[in-house]
Amino acid sequence: MPRPIFALISPTALRHNLSVVRQHLNRAAVAAGGVPPSIWAVIKANAYGHGIERALRAFSEAQGLAMLDIEEAVRCREAGWAGPILLLEGFFTPQDIDLLDRYHISTAVHCQEQLDMLARARPSHRINAMVKLNSGMNRLGFSPQAYGAAFEAAQALMRDGVLGSVGKMTHFATADGPQGPQWQWEVFQAATQGLPGPVSVCNSAATLRYPELAAGPGATHWVRPGICLYGASPFSDTPAAAFGLRPAMTLRAEIIGVQQVSPGQTVGYGATFAASKAMRVGVVSCGYADGYPRHCATGTPVTVNGVATRLLGRVSMDMMMVDLDPVPAAGVGAPVVLWGEGGPDVDAVAAAGGTIGYELLTALAARVPVRDAS
């Protein structure tokens, strides 16, 4: 028998979350007197660990897909996706431009080197592009001072038949926090004033909390929701459920051993947990080699037999220990939910480990089998 651990992915939850985002944007558009933006469903990092092909089927109602890897983009085309695809980091070599041309893939353009490669290209089809502004995150994009010239260079490539539509995009650094995105939005507006083409500025956090930035009248807007489509929250202060989102990934395991621990005895590496009373301790078939955060400490939530309990001591490579006192009927073979449907929120587990839900979902180990939920 295989080791008792697996991840369940719910296509129903994926579809539901896309619908929630769409309805949220529709309401914002009505309030602003504008048109609802189009949605690029972000499926980078193997669809945040959920599987590219699975996400393709679930997000069939999205207007487009956004990702990083050109090979994943080609897989989407070969799997039958006919809508727009955007490469968020753009391309890296002249040979990549051949693939953009052959598979009708759109690209971000964020540096002069990419413009230079495009200027030397002779594609058989026009390539759509989004010229990226560095509005303050200082990651990718042209500076506000250089943006006008970069956009004009892209328009020249459009006139030369290399590029098709040319749009404007940026990425918000603080849409998930109290500072908000307004400071970057003002930089973006100033740098792009009077420039034509579609606009894309909203990530998951901005889509959920500041949808008016993409729902007002004027240019065609595209939003780029990612983590929220998978049922996790981009915010540390607001759970995904507050937006009506459902977890798409559930990590399940089992109790594979039970220990009777006496008062004063310790549990796990480093003896970091000492029992204050006699207690039952369950050994779970999941560890940090499966993608569970090693830094999660005693008290991290976990569910056994449908009952909330807690992690005890340090997480091992292949196992972890949990408190079975709240679950007196649980023994070997009892089902365990580490995160997801019927268990703790992935963001709560991540917070206990000093990280974010994004990391847990994308770091699920290859040795963990992944199944579709029925």
Swiss-Prot record:
Which co-factors does it depend on? Answer: pyridoxal 5'-phosphate
Query: Which residues are recorded as modified (N6-(pyridoxal phosphate)lysine)?
Result: 44
Pathway, per UniProt? Amino-acid biosynthesis; D-alanine biosynthesis; D-alanine from L-alanine: step 1/1
> What is the species listed in this Swiss-Prot or TrEMBL entry?
Bordetella avium (strain 197N)
UniProt-recorded Gene Ontology molecular function terms: alanine racemase activity; pyridoxal phosphate binding
- What keywords is this UniProt entry annotated with? Isomerase, Pyridoxal phosphate
Q: What is its EC number?
A: 5.1.1.1
Tell me the enzyme class. isomerase
The record's function comment reads: Catalyzes the interconversion of L-alanine and D-alanine. May also act on other amino acids.
Family, according to the entry, reads as follows: Belongs to the alanine racemase family.
Positions bound to substrate: 139, 317
Q: Which SUPFAM superfamilies match?
A: Alanine racemase C-terminal domain-like, PLP-binding barrel
- Residues forming the catalytic site: 44, 269
Q: For this chain's UniProt record, which GO biological process terms are given?
A: D-alanine biosynthetic process
This protein's name: Alanine racemase
The chemistry this enzyme catalyses reads:
L-alanine = D-alanine
> What does the entry list under GO cellular component?
cytosol
Source taxonomy lineage? Answer: Bacteria, Pseudomonadati, Pseudomonadota, Betaproteobacteria, Burkholderiales
